[in-house]
């Protein structure tokens, strides 16, 4: 069944007041964790004493398999040791397999890099899991080795979730609009999506091969709004299909636990999408580059709702949009009862990203977890001069998580809790926040 048809069926059901494959868990007390864990025993003891019960452990594909077919046994042993240390400390683990850290040889595979609409190649992008058959084969082999080794040495019982995504930050979506050195670049212009050469099994070819967003003509004829809409559905749908592929790959390898899909921002708002389609995706109604990133959460969450065991991980609790929405009258930063319907029926342009995206996840029946962006001056955190400081994020973000119905809050990052307060926060600060939540 074509992905666009799946979207139509699920969206029709949701708009009728139900959610397909609803899997939202009964609300439970908020669990607290950290991102970027080392699983170092002394730190684990301190974290557990503060009330932390879960950590995110990053693994790097390029370190696991630096050469094609050659596994770094010492690195694997180190990861296994980290997991064992967490298990002994009574701390659950969210595993990040690190597909967004592909080895150089993966990028050299046929179709190994995403190609932009202006000829660019994304700098530092993750593995090209969206369209490339060869990259997906390599990724599946890597995941099978990772899961097999962890299953043999550790078992998977202490792994609370595995994170999956498609971009260089490990989140859902394509690279940013400027990641290839050009302005406003879309990312589906390699031979696989345009010609079918090396296209992954089950992935659709572009519905308008050769058409570039912004152009009013294709094959000598005027482009219709319907054609642009179909192209957008294909573009955004291909990104979420790559996430579904990863979940299915993990299931086929025997992992049956929760899967977290990190998402940032609020994606393209429905009203903005209508304007963008009318303008042939020429850049209008695109305030934050969500179009080029292919983020259409209303439709994409509908697809994820059909996959059992999936939680949305919102990565920007108390991001810059929350700081702005907090200052409006009335304030629009906090999640509120009834947001699930308001999100699709009212003007939500003044809402914070966390409020809008959480409402869509709840509407789709998906589980919800969240994390703060991290230090505003760190790369990939979306920080600006208007962002809250790390200390302000620690004070504010957990409350947002509760308001939005999340079951878990992950603080970014572990290192910032053990840097003697250089980042403005300490583990004692986090402990106080956790104690106040109970």
List where the protein language model places each region.
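Substrate-binding cleft of secreted/luminal carbohydrate-active enzymes
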Residues: 98, 102, 297-327, 331-438
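Aromatic-lined substrate-binding rim segments of carbohydrate-active enzymes
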Residues: 42-50, 56-121, 147-151, 251-253
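Polysaccharide-binding and catalytic clefts of secreted carbohydrate-active enzymes
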Residues: 121-303, 310
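Catalytic domains of carbohydrate-active enzymes, especially glycoside hydrolases
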Residues: 37-62, 81, 92-94, 301-313, ...
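Hydrophobic faces of well-ordered beta-strands that scaffold small-molecule active sites
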Residues: 30-34, 55-57, 93-97, 160-164, ...
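Bacterial N-terminal signal peptides
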Residues: 4-15
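The substrate-binding groove and active-site-proximal loops of carbohydrate-active enzymes
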Residues: 29-36, 61-76, 122-141, 225-241, ...
